[in-house]
Amino acid sequence: MFLMKEIPCKAKEIGYFPLFTDEYPSVLLRTVHSVINRTPDNLLREVVLVDDFSQHENLGFPLIEHLRRFGKKVRLLRAHTRLGLIRAKLAGAKYARGDVVVFLDSHCEANEGWLEPLLQRIKKQRSAVVCPVIDIISDQTMEYQIGGAGGIGTFWWSLHYSMSEIPEREKKRRKNPEVDPLLTPTMAGGLFAVNREYFFEVGGYDPGMDIWGGENLEISFRVWMCGGTLEIIPCSHVGHIYRNGHPYNMTGPGNNKDVHGTNSKRLAEVWMDDYKRLFYVHRMGLKNVDVGDLSERILLRKRLNCKSFKWFLDNIIPEKFVPDEDVKAYGLVQNLNGKLCLDTLQRLENKGIVNLGVWECQIEGSSSQVVIFFNGPTVEILK
């Protein structure tokens, strides 16, 4: 049982902003109804649905008619051109009137008592960016499956989001794991709450990023490096439908088919200092790609007096393996009688353990890079 302290209602009115693009109407309305039905009325100032240029006919007039039942509590904003998830989220947050903004994907279900633990933590620490425990909703049966805070958010050097087990240091720090916030280096990015003023003070989202991808790691690194914290709150649960792929067009301006890559380069150039070299090991094709003006984000980092990325690695995620540091060897494993090297054959690093093959050596290619290090009396090879 979770016992909540009283939260002054006027001090913590929230605005909730589900962003959607051609979402299934029943799934979208499940999200909206669950938030309204399971949130104390004095805490929920508004629900603002941000429609990022949907084309589904049932998200037109039928949606407007359905939302009338909520009166002024629910508003609908429509973009007349495609903004993309990142800029649409920024637009919603700027439109907000509540003290706290809550971002939940449009395919969620808020559980009982989901909001109060998030607000309580923000009330205690204004610079805390807080996430609920994300439960699974089956994309086949729509069944809600309750879970727990069993891991933390991390990242691959290719700048894809990943998760890992809770480290021992964090287990020791938390006296009551059923209640105490879980510090997490990164977040998935679809479900979190933040003080609205703090969100913009620390830089909001990078408006130079297109559509989707990379924004979750960018805000994660930035919050930690600039004095905030990123936390998972065990008492707060929200269900989420994990979908296979994206149901909408992911092509960016100029027919850019790799918005995740170009967004990640913006992140690497501004926030990762010399460690951006490890990103380019995986994405060497992006080295000479123009990703727009970075001057405003660089000035933001200077203005906030943010710490270095090495500080982030040493203090927030010390378990993170740095491939070219503290190892016995780093480079290619080549057959001396030929030009073949050990290679992952383009199997992605974020898919777990992969079987190695051989391929023509690629001096700058991530798939041919091998790390050798000692583990007790044995020698291990890590791709």
What are these regions (language model features)?
Residues 80-96:
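Glycine-rich, basic loop-to-helix element that forms the pyrophosphate-binding segment
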Residues 319-383:
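Lectin-like carbohydrate-binding module/patch detector with strong preference for beta-trefoil
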Residues 36-78:
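Acidic donor-binding segment of Leloir-type glycosyltransferases
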